[in-house]
């Protein structure tokens, strides 16, 4: 190869093998601008990476400041990859059979830089769903409760949300809506006991908290003052584990 071609090339390291191999490479002080990493994909069911191992590998990559990539699998009919086994083609075993956009949301939430579809051919619907993902912010798909008032609907779907820094293990609190909508009426209208994944907008009965949006991280007894206004779809509930202090998040309506 011409020298200029080699100079512009990058070396891709296998990100799935653990940190020993990586430590060996990095001990030779390579030009990190020319080093990237990518995880494997796994065509046979039950052979994909565990989340724990995946996270440990990624931690090592990030400590070295290396770019990371991982694979998602299309669930379209008759997809195929480089091997004759056709049981999906993902990096994480837990992603097998998940909607492709949920797989990608999860990878981005873990800090992965690039997401690659491993098998052919993703459907138009899958490609569209992937194109609508916000890499910079957790976005949850939700279903609104029947009869939700317009202000509560607007708070859920249109306002900018971020969790408070003084984090609660029971809920993520987005408090700016109670400031913006101070003086508006928030009568109680739907106050069942609260389940993990429920979206709450506090009612007037909570006085100074009226209008505050909360995301339930655990099941809770409802005092009768908290309006449950929406719920995160079941397949995305595990993404709640990625809400940390100051995490930005948003919601979109299930189609």
Give the location of each predicted region.
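Generic serine detector
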Residues: 9, 16-19, 27, 50, ...
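C-terminal functional modules
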Residues: 145-255
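Short, small-residue-biased leader/transition segments that mark boundaries at the very start
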Residues: 1-6
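Short beta-strand/loop segments at the ligand-binding rim of alpha/beta enzyme cores
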Residues: 7-11, 65-68
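Catalytic alpha/beta core domains of metabolic enzymes, predominantly
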Residues: 16-149
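N-terminal start-of-chain detector that recognizes signal peptides
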Residues: 9-11, 41, 86-88, 185-189
């Amino acid at each position: 190869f011409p020298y200029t071609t080699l100079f512009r090339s990058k070396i891709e390291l296998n990100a799935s093998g653990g940190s020993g191999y990586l430590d060996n490479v990095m001990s030779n002080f390579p030009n990190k601008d020319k080093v990237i990493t990518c995880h494997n994909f796994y065509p046979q069911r039950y052979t994909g990476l565990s989340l724990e191992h995946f996270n440990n590998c990624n931690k090592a990559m990030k400590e070295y400041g290396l770019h990371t990539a991982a694979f998602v699998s299309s669930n379209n009919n008759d997809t195929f990859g480089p091997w004759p086994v056709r049981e999906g083609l993902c990096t994480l075993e837990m992603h097998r059979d998940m909607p492709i956009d949920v797989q990608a949301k999860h990878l981005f939430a873990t800090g992965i830089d690039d997401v690659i579809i491993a098998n052919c051919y993703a459907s138009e619907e899958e490609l569209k769903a992937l194109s609508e993902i916000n890499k910079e912010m957790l976005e949850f798909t939700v279903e609104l409760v029947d009869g939700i008032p317009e202000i509560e609907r607007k708070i859920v779907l249109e306002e900018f949300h971020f969790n408070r820094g003084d984090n609660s293990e029971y809920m993520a609190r987005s408090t700016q809506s109670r400031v913006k909508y101070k003086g508006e009426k928030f009568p109680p209208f739907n106050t069942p006991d609260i389940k993990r994944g429920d979206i709450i907008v506090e009612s007037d009965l909570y006085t100074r908290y009226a209008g505050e949006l909360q995301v339930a991280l655990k099941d809770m007894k409802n005092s009768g003052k908290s309006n449950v206004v929406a719920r995160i779809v079941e397949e995305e509930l595990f993404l709640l584990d990625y809400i940390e202090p100051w995490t930005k998040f948003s919601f979109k309506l299930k189609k």
